[in-house]
């Protein structure tokens, strides 16, 4: 059996928890909770988590499906180098971002999800995984002479392949199923 790539699961979990943090923060801020400033913090933390987690990392084996518009955020995440590539740093960053939001009921679900994502990232880091960007593969252009072996000799419309085989057999002198010459003379007398 193949080995589980934990970073892929942590990425999905962290992205979902960032969206949940944003939603809980909007509820807390718009609802004018007593600690509404923690709701505003949750919105900012959720946006930061979503921006960091939106670009998927390249899988070590197999192909990775890129998210829509990921290539633009991938450049930004690549700029931070080891700060974003190392999963130990991501695990502790997510855990640190989750703690203040845990003191408000509207954002506690996002906090729990982000803490779970942090644990999965820690597991991925222990197993030696690290983030690497999905690089677009250069498109190979087919060689012009390599795909066409022999250009057609007669212009279109061409007869079907079976008819072309019969024509080539007739040219070679091979008898076909058509009319044959009778070696005995036949006299036709009509009465």
Curated annotation (Swiss-Prot):
Give a Gene Ontology cellular component term annotated to this protein.
Answer: plasma membrane
Residue numbers bearing the Phosphothreonine modification: 147
Q: What is the lineage of its organism?
A: Eukaryota, Metazoa, Chordata, Craniata, Vertebrata
Write the gene name. Answer: CYBA
Q: Which GO terms describe its biological process?
A: innate immune response
Q: Give the UniProt subcellular location, in the record's own words.
A: Cell membrane
Where does the sequence pass through the membrane? 8-30, 36-53, 87-104, 106-126
Task: Report the protein name in the record.
Answer: Cytochrome b-245 light chain
Function summary: Subunit of NADPH oxidase complexes that is required for the NADPH oxidase activity that generates, in various cell types, superoxide from molecular oxygen utilizing NADPH as an electron donor. Subunit of the phagocyte NADPH oxidase complex that mediates the transfer of electrons from cytosolic NADPH to O2 to produce the superoxide anion (O2(-)). In the activated complex, electrons are first transferred from NADPH to flavin adenine dinucleotide (FAD) and subsequently transferred via two heme molecules to molecular oxygen, producing superoxide through an outer-sphere reaction.
Question: What positions are modified (Phosphoserine)?
Answer: 168
Where is the stretch described as Disordered? 134-191
Q: Look up keyword Zinc and say if it applies.
A: no
Question: What are the GO MF terms of this UniProt record?
Answer: heme binding; metal ion binding; oxidoreductase activity
Protein's membrane topology:
Multi-pass membrane protein
* Side of membrane Cytoplasmic, spans: 2-7, 54-69, 81-86, 127-191
Instruction: Alphabetically list the UniProt keywords.
Output: Cell membrane, Electron transport, Heme, Iron, Isopeptide bond, Membrane, Metal-binding, NADP, Oxidoreductase, Phosphoprotein, Transmembrane, Transmembrane helix, Transport, Ubl conjugation
Cross-link Glycyl lysine isopeptide (Lys-Gly) (interchain with G-Cter in ubiquitin): give the residues.
Answer: 149
